[in-house]
Amino acid sequence: MTSILLALAILGYLSIIFESPIRINKTITSILTGSLCWIVYALLYDGDKHEVAEKLIQHFGEISGLLIFLLGAMTIVELIDIHKGFSVITNRIRTKSVLKLLWIVGGITFFMSALLDNLATAIIMITLLRKLMPKSETRMILAGIVVIAANAGGAFSPIGDITTTLLWIGGQVSAYGIVKVLFLPSLMCILVPLIIASYRMKGFTMLRVQLSMAEVIKEEKMRGSLSVFLAGVFGLVMVPVIKSITGLPPFIGVLMALAFVSLVSIIYHRNKPQEVKEKYSVAYALSKVDVSSILYFMGILLLVYVLQEVQILSQLSVFLQQSF
């Protein structure tokens, strides 16, 4: 049984890696692999089949907590984006210097990814860069810095990256421990590329027509943008605090934060027509959430837990410790 499950896991991961050539979405592959492995495990299990069902239900409870957490956090980010909340920061970027823009964009991305999540932050900042300047070597370098900064910033936060979130929710690490141990290494991971890029970009100049991000990105000033942005950031920051004080799973804090942000939005749009209110509602924000990513992680976690049940992961851990 162990050999069959290991073979299925390897085949599944290879299919995910070669998603583009085989033209099969990685979400479908992960769900199929995770589900199939549990079916094989149940069919070949020597004991009572009800024990397998109980184990699956127990593990899926943990998985559900993570999925609800991700769904809530991603919905908060979408609500902020719908209200043009991120323009509160980006519209204050005013510089004609490429070097200054490099450091400003890198710094904003680094800290924003720690408060939100690295993927959403990278998408937001790269979208802004595309509006700020035409395709060029300068934009490519800045986009590269955005990706590095987003990953570095998300690494030292319990809610900034899916990996740290998994470890935090699973109880392997604490929120304070992640920040304490990983902040300086994460900071170095962005400072070194910024310094290297600064030397490479000496002599680069901005196009004359592009004086500031605020002038290029003429965001409509929306009533409540600042309030929704601050409510979202405050709510997400409070998630680790609520967990440490109450001991409750993080998804409780995220759900409370989502309700808080939604309430702020409702207050600002309460006197508008119903069709306008719907454009700023939680339901509309949910429709913009990347649900396929959530399902992808569900499949991966199902696979991980079944491998854990047959001791493959523990044996691999012992092997790596003895080898290295």
Residue ranges of model-derived segments:
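Transmembrane helical segments that form the transport core of multi-pass membrane transport proteins
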Residues: 83, 92, 105, 235, ...
